[in-house]
Swiss-Prot record:
Region ranges (Disordered): 1-38
UniProt protein name: Lysine/arginine permease CAN1
Pfam families tied to this protein: AA_permease (PF00324)
Gene from which this protein is expressed: CAN1
Low complexity bias spans: 19-30
Source organism of the structure: Candida albicans (strain SC5314 / ATCC MYA-2876) (Yeast)
GO molecular function: amino acid binding; amino acid transmembrane transporter activity; basic amino acid transmembrane transporter activity; L-histidine transmembrane transporter activity; L-lysine transmembrane transporter activity
Family: Belongs to the amino acid-polyamine-organocation (APC) superfamily. YAT (TC 2.A.3.10) family.
Transmembrane segments: 69-89, 92-112, 148-168, 174-194, 204-224, 258-278, 297-317, 343-363, 393-413, 422-442, 465-485, 504-524
Membrane topology reported for the UniProt record: Multi-pass membrane protein
Length: 571
């Protein structure tokens, strides 16, 4: 740990701005220099002492280990997006554009996770980045962003439930779809009331199955490309003779591939959504777990996403009729289609079981993530206080119950418009997630400016993000541009349904932001004071929640055996 950071934590530098650095449970109540925004950080309608909140409601526990944190990030990401919605992406954009889309979103993910890592390791609190926007941008913006991000995960839980039964119907449709949804709805909800260490342990082993399966599929795909399947050597067969770029999505040839690329970004972003989950665990994870997991994000993305997309494009032609056939989402999965096209009989059934496990794991992570975001919003004073209440295991049970209730959206799959409902939910969650990514970058820019104002070098932080501040500005600009243009194709043949599908999350965010602004500051002329619209740098709170962490807590012990070395690399 850099010496300057140690001095800063112990209160020996920057005296003009310094407060004693203590856990959030005490730093707010004991600070003598609270600004309006800082005191609002844990209040509802009146100023509430953080220590009294913990006494009354309890608090989450830091029971997650490094392997748990890494697997939660993987478990929440590798799910419906990768295994199922990539089929729609491949069909719409072709193999090359799909790969380019994945690589482009990879750059956004890298920027966002780097920004998040620098902030979350410095101030490790539950639902961290929802609170960061509240502290460093504005309370109303933070409330809107946090609620929208929570909404995206609550809706994603419903989306996962809508798919799991259809995946099981790959084998049999004797059991009604609603029955499968109900079974997993109840099981996953109940499980999230157990202490977080049990959640972390189960998620570790389920996510381990995912990792082994994805690695196995990549090896299998490589062998098939080289000629082991019934079709002989495939190579780049489906990248030649016009197959590489697909058909585009416009009737004329003007810009049809650009339009396809932009339209396909939503599928790509939905697939990648969840890479930021490592920061959601900040309040329940050890410091070394956070830093280690964030450093490996890029490796996981390149292996689990980019390589998979590459081989899917090599083995499955974009115009394969199976990508759009009726009969359930699993039958549209490029993973299974690649196996079937290669003549493998048993593997599709084995991999379908993996997909079922994957969706269950993702749904589990959806509830966990949403509940911790809601807990963080309550800490920040922008959600009702009762969401802070925890059980003896440190689980915010009201937050869990409220988040899980949105699993009822899964029953939309039982209607005749089930596929349309899936697309609608996918667009809502992807766009909402992208808005949150953009504000993570905005928060990091404000965080860096506040550090600079206080004379604190980023070299002294527990984790220093790469390519800053350029990377943060890149993430902010690209995220907001994509949010605005991702649905532009609806204007070619405009109808209200498609418009709201594309932009409902944007509309919801604006309504929440304006509504919270007037709720917090009223309708008077002071409502539009610049300090209410954007927190002044001198008032940005970078003290509350900073933990007194010693060097040993950041040291990662060396692997003891080959098994430890393997997990040290992949997780």
């Amino acid at each position: 740990m850099p010496e300057d950071y140690e001095k800063y934590r112990m209160g020996s530098s920057n005296e003009s701005h310094q407060k004693s650095v203590q856990p959030i449970s005490s730093s707010i109540s004991k600070s003598n220099k609270k600004t309006k925004h800082q005191t609002d950080f844990v209040q509802d309608s009146d100023i509430i002492e953080a220590s009294s909140i913990n006494d009354e409601f309890g608090e989450v526990k830091r029971d997650l280990k490094a392997r748990h944190v890494s697997m939660i990030a993987i478990g929440g990401t590798i799910g419906t997006g990768l295994f199922i919605s990539t089929g729609s992406l491949l069909h719409t954009t072709g193999p090359v554009m799909s790969l380019i889309s994945f690589l482009f979103v990879t750059t956004i993910c890298f920027s966002v996770t780097q920004s998040l890592g620098e902030m979350a390791t410095y101030i490790p609190i539950s639902g961290s980045f929802a609170q960061f926007v509240t502290r460093w941008v504005s309370k109303s913006c933070g409330a809107a962003n946090g609620w929208l991000y929570w909404f995206s995960w609550a809706v994603t839980f419903g989306l996962e439930l809508s798919v799991v039964g259809q995946v099981i119907q790959f084998w049999t449709d004797a059991v009604p779809l609603a029955a499968w949804i109900s079974i997993f709805f109840v099981i996953l909800t109940i499980f999230n009331f157990f202490p977080v260490k049990f959640y972390g342990e189960v998620e570790f082993w389920i996510a381990s199955i995912k990792i082994i399966a994805v690695f196995g599929w990549i090896i299998y795909a490589f062998i098939m490309v080289c000629g082991a399947g019934k079709t002989g050597p495939v190579g780049f067969r489906y990248w030649r003779n016009g197959y590489a770029w697909g058909d585009g999505i416009l009737v004329n040839n003007n810009g049809k591939y650009v339009a396809a690329f932009v339209s396909g970004l939503i599928n790509s972003i939905f697939t990648f959504q969840g890479t930021e989950l490592v920061a959601v665990t900040a309040g329940e994870a050890s410091p070394r777990a956070l830093r280690s997991a964030i450093r490996k994000v890029m490796f996981r993305i390149l292996v689990f996403y980019v390589l998979c997309m590459l081989f899917m494009g090599l083995l499955v032609p974009y115009n394969d009729p199976k990508l759009t056939q009726d009969g359930g989402f699993t039958r549209n999965s490029p993973f299974l289609i690649a196996m079937e096209n290669s003549g493998t009989k048993v593997l599709p059934h084995i991999f379908n079981a993996v997909i079922v496990t994957t969706i269950i794991s993702a749904g589990n992570s959806n509830i966990y993530s949403g509940s911790r975001i809601l807990y963080g919003l309550a800490q920040a004073g922008v959600a009702p206080k009762f969401f802070l209440r925890t059980n003896k295991g440190g689980v915010p049970f009201f937050a869990v119950a409220f988040t899980a209730a949105f699993g009822a959206l899964g029953y939309l799959a039982c209607s005749s418009q089930g596929n349309k409902a899936f697309t609608w939910l996918l667009n809502i969650t992807a766009t909402a997630g992208l808005i949150s990514w953009g504000f993570i970058s905005v928060s990091h820019i404000r965080f860096m400016k506040t550090l600079q104002r206080r004379g604190i070098s980023r070299d002294t932080l527990p984790f220093k993000a790469f390519f800053m501040p350029f990377s943060a500005y890149y993430g902010m600009v690209v995220c907001f541009i994509v949010v605005l243009i991702q649905g532009f194709t609806v204007f070619w043949d405009f109808n209200a349904s498609d418009f709201f599908t594309a932009y409902i999350s944007v509309i919801l965010f604006v309504v929440l932001w304006v509504g919270f602004h007037f709720f917090f500051y009223g309708f008077g002329k002071d409502s539009f004071k610049m300090s209410n619209i954007l927190v002044p740098l001198d008032e940005c709170d970078i003290d509350s929640g900073v933990r007194d962490i010693n060097d040993a807590e950041f040291d990662i012990p060396p692997p003891k055996n080959a098994w430890d070395k393997f997990w040290a690399i992949v997780a």
